[in-house]
Amino acid sequence: FGGKRSKPYAMPPLVKTPVLSKFETAAKQTGCHPYMIPAAIASEPYTTPDGVTHNPCMYCGFCERFGCEYDAKAEPNNTFIPVAEKTGNCEIRCNANVVEILKKGNKVTGVRYIDTLTLEEFIQPADVVVLSSYVMNNAKLLMVSKIGKQYDPKTGQGTLGRGYCYQITPGATLFFEEPMNLFAGAGALGMCYDDFNADNFDHSDLKFIHGGVISLTQTGKRPIESNATPPGTRAWGSEFKKAAAYNFNRSLGIGAQGASIAYKANYLSLDKTYKDAYGLPLLRMTYNFTDQDRALFDYITKKIEEVAKAMNPKAMASKPSPKDYNIVPYQTTHNTGGTITGKSPEDSVVNSYLQHWDAENLFVVGAGNFPHNGGCNP
């Protein structure tokens, strides 16, 4: 299911652990085609074309939310930033919060930023400005800078903030009797399959479009983060503590990243009441799950349960289908939309080169350029 590549991957996949082999066998038993997830983590010593050396991953388990002490994981601070600084043409200004893009005519002239430590305000002139500050902040900066026409859900006019999409995240937790050394792992160490992603399967009698990738990852369990107990376990007291300790190294999670389609009622805008520390309106997210989301969620959940049962757990628990969106429990931060790319200013914020239609020297870069969220992370 992988797309065509101009050249092979630079290194072999990360190690296939016993847990991943167990998932692979079960997936094949259900007729699917699992493969190791490509990862920006060195599986062996590697020197980049820029001359940056990366050591192999040690599978320490402190990876996906941490810096890498081995320089095995590709991060800005050990890839392009040191290379850029060596040219003498790059300066990194820390604690600088850009609050406005300055525009004159059909070009931007720079940015206004605030030193977050001293609260001093600075004007930085620029020949070219690149927004690369995540989906939400890219949209907010354009809005507070009054660049582009903000989307109005009542009329359908405007493009800025339009097309905000999320993800659906079906999943199941499996409990086993044998310990699995789950403290070891890496941020993208895992196995997945695309048999139920995109149009890789028949949608004739289904009530949704698109699909999602199903995966099992071994990122390194940490006690506070991971505290699964089997269904029926008491939620407090000695029974809970015993079950939590026993199952810490005996539970696995199978999950999916499901597509999210753009709807007129889901969008980003500026809040009319609440402001940030600099007196600017906060970004407001108007969003809820749809029947499309729920139908896809329920279908993928059944497919997850099939592979889960093939792994022969002693118990399992599936995530319930989503009702209304709730921002409190963490679900995903792989959002899209709000600054989508397209063929004209009437239907998009940027062109195919990610240049803003209203300012040729302003580039808006990020997952916000996608008009919907696919069945894997953008």
What is each model feature region?
Residues 1-97, 328-331:
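Conserved redox-cofactor binding core of oxidoreductases
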Residues 37, 59-63, 99-104, 249-260, ...:
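A glycine-rich dinucleotide-binding beta-alpha-beta segment and adjacent secondary-structure elements
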Residues 46, 140-142, 374:
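Short glycine-/acidic-enriched loop or helix-start segments at secondary-structure transitions
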Residues 49-54, 103-109, 332-335:
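A short, glycine/Asx- and small/polar-enriched loop/turn
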Residues 82-86, 116-123, 341, 347-357:
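A short acidic-Thr-Gly-centered motif at the start of a beta-strand
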Residues 86-87, 96, 100-104, 111-187, ...:
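Glycine-rich loop(s) and the adjacent beta-strand/alpha-helix scaffold that form part
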Residues 157-284, 288-294, 332-337, 347, ...:
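FAD cofactor-binding and catalytic pocket of flavoenzymes
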Residues 372-378:
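A conserved FAD-binding loop/helix module that cradles the flavin
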